[in-house]
């Protein structure tokens, strides 16, 4: 079983934290290839999605960044 994350939403969440994909790899403990798959809209395991979301929720959003991002 697998699921897909929204590419745009994941990229936005990374930007809000000032993170790169490599930062997400380190914070989530997931392989770079799995993070790449998620960022390109390919299916990933639900357990990987859980780890991605958990890592993002633990990281603070940088104040003022949202206003700088295009919607």
What does each of the following model-derived ranges do?
Residues 1-27, 66-67:
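A short, Lys/Arg-rich alpha-helix, primarily the initiator
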Residues 4, 43-46:
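Generic alpha-helical scaffold signal
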Residues 23-24, 41, 58:
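Compositionally biased non-globular segments, especially hydrophobic aliphatic-rich helices
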Residues 25, 36, 50-53, 69:
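Key DNA-contacting residues within the recognition helix of helix-turn-helix
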Residues 29-44:
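Recognition helix of helix-turn-helix/homeodomain-like DNA-binding domains
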Residues 46-65:
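DNA major-groove recognition helix of helix-turn-helix/homeodomain DNA-binding modules
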């Amino acid at each position: 079983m697998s699921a897909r994350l929204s590419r745009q939403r994941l990229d936005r969440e990374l930007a809000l934290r000032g993170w790169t994909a490599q930062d997400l790899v380190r914070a989530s403990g997931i392989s770079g290839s799995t993070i790449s798959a998620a960022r390109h809209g390919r299916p990933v395991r639900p357990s990987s999605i859980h780890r991605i979301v958990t890592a993002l929720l633990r990281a603070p959003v940088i104040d003022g960044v949202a206003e700088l991002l295009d919607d």
